[in-house]
Amino acid sequence: MSAWVLALFSLLHTAPSLSRPVLPHTALAVYISADAGQSPAPLEYMKRELSGIMQSAGYRVVYGDPRKPDTAAGFSKLVVLELRGNCGMPPGNYRLERAVASGVSLAETSVSSGVVMPFSRINCANLTRTIGPLLADEAGAQRDYFYGRAMARVAAHEIYHVTMGSQDHSHEGVAKPSFTVADLLDERFDFDRVALAHLRQSAADVASRP
């Protein structure tokens, strides 16, 4: 296990468009690992959308770099999110090199001996092949916006597994087993009521620990 992963584990402790509801929040650290050439615009849109989704679930997302963990913060919940590949679509013509297969994975979270680990990965090549054809005619800034928002929804799904410590899914919303293209690109896509109740209870349980 690398030094920065060990450092991130040391941060964990047991101490105490349409608007989304504002709730008391439990701090959730999301450490993002991306290629050096990652375009910042889709990433910023992803952060904005992800913060809103998790806020409604009772979590306040704090972003960081896994190579420079904040050892003084003492976050209650922590996720390392790796962005694999080129996460975005540059301005200009878009050519679909290979169609995405039905049921292809957009992301995954590590599981060890049945235990959900706080390490998730987004497969941006598969995401691009999924939504790229619908964004081909959009201007560069709009592509960044829609792409970043789609990334956030995929990330929120994986973070659900990490925060709940479970591989289970809901029947609807962000925590359901698979997404449609509409889920990724529609104006609004959130956790359903059942998933929200579970997440809010989890956040409250963490916040109440002595």
How should each PLM-predicted stretch be described?
Residues 18-22, 31-48, 110-150, 162-210:
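Metalloprotease/metallohydrolase-associated module, dominated by Zn2+-dependent proteases
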